[in-house]
A protein has these predicted regions:
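Short beta-strand-centered segments at strand-helix junctions
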Residues: 163-178
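Loop/turn positions that initiate beta-strands
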Residues: 8, 40-43, 184-187
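Intrinsically disordered, low-complexity Ser/Thr-rich linker and spacer segments
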Residues: 1-3, 44-63, 194-201
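Gly/Pro-biased beta-strand-loop elements
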Residues: 49-157, 176-179, 208-267
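A short beta-strand-loop micro-motif that forms or neighbors metal/cofactor-
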Residues: 180-196
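Short, basic/aromatic beta-hairpin or loop at an interaction surface
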Residues: 15-22, 155-165
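Primarily a LysM-type cell-wall glycan-binding module
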Residues: 1-19
Length: 267
């Protein structure tokens, strides 16, 4: 789709808004990642993502994909781009549960972050009251003693790895999720940089992300394994697969062979 640039927009802010990597957004529009945007300028945006459906009820967060999905009764109700932990301060993986929801939460600054403030020469803060300077934003969803899903006062940090492990959403997205998700809901945080999907019409899509935490193996081996499990090896354009792996744009890209090629191969 196309997006009309607003005052104050940058490639970073547009990418954060829609869940598209800055490099991919720049390449799609034949721009440099550092390019300045003009109000009214039209940008092509491609934020197609493969939905990782691993539970029927609750929240699924795929770290390399930087996406959060909320399911209820097997149906996808919402999908949002998120900001996650930097490589040196990683977002935890595993099974969690929503234990608390709170609006306008005072941020009690963890000692580890206080130490980081001092090391970087920043003013030391132990508590940050609700308001525009609170990095938690207006909504807080606790999923562990030390981790939560929350808003932000820095919207351009969304769809990037810049947090101390928590999961950030845009203010309007966390407000929507806050109303939908109940206390007790399941939360699964997974690490899947390679995703393969077959749509009802038979088309095959591959989505490959950088291995930001260096936890994954060979992406081509992962695609081979998924394709074999789905029985679609002969339907895949493996040259295209290699291109998608090399680029790692983090977008769902079609990798299926034309029907004629498949039929010819089956003769």
């Amino acid at each position: 789709f196309t997006y009309a640039v607003q005052n104050g927009d940058s490639l970073i802010s547009v990418g954060a808004q829609f869940g598209e990597d800055v490099a991919a957004l720049a390449a799609l529009n034949e721009l440099k990642p550092s390019a300045r945007l003009k109000p009214g300028q039209e940008l092509h945006v491609d934020n197609r993502h493969i939905v990782l459906h691993v539970i029927d009820d609750g929240i699924v967060i795929n770290v390399p994909q930087r996406m959060l999905f909320y399911f209820h009764s097997g149906k996808l109700l919402a999908g949002f781009p998120v900001g996650l932990g930097k490589r040196t301060w990683q977002t935890m993986l595993g099974d969690f549960e929503v234990s608390e929801k709170e609006k306008d939460k005072t941020w009690i600054v963890p000692e580890s972050i206080q130490e980081e403030m001092v090391a970087k020469g920043k003013p030391l803060k132990k508590r940050v009251p609700p308001g525009p300077n609170n990095p938690l934003g207006k909504h807080w969803i606790r999923i562990s003693p030390s981790c939560g899903i929350h808003g932000t006062n820095a919207p351009t940090s969304i769809y990037r790895f810049q947090t101390h492990g928590c999961i950030r959403l845009k203010p309007e997205d966390i407000a929507s999720l806050f109303e939908k998700v109940p206390v007790g809901a399941a939360v699964e945080i997974v690490y899947e940089p390679v995703l393969l999907a077959r749509l009802p019409d038979g088309k095959l899509y591959l989505e490959v992300h950088p291995d930001i935490y260096r936890k994954a193996g060979d992406p081509l081996a992962a695609v081979n394994q998924m394709a074999a499990a789905a029985g679609v090896e002969s339907m895949i354009d493996w040259q295209k697969v290699n291109e998608v792996i090399k680029e790692r744009r983090g977008l769902a890209q079609e990798v299926g062979l034309p029907v004629e090629s498949i039929l010819k191969g089956n003769r």
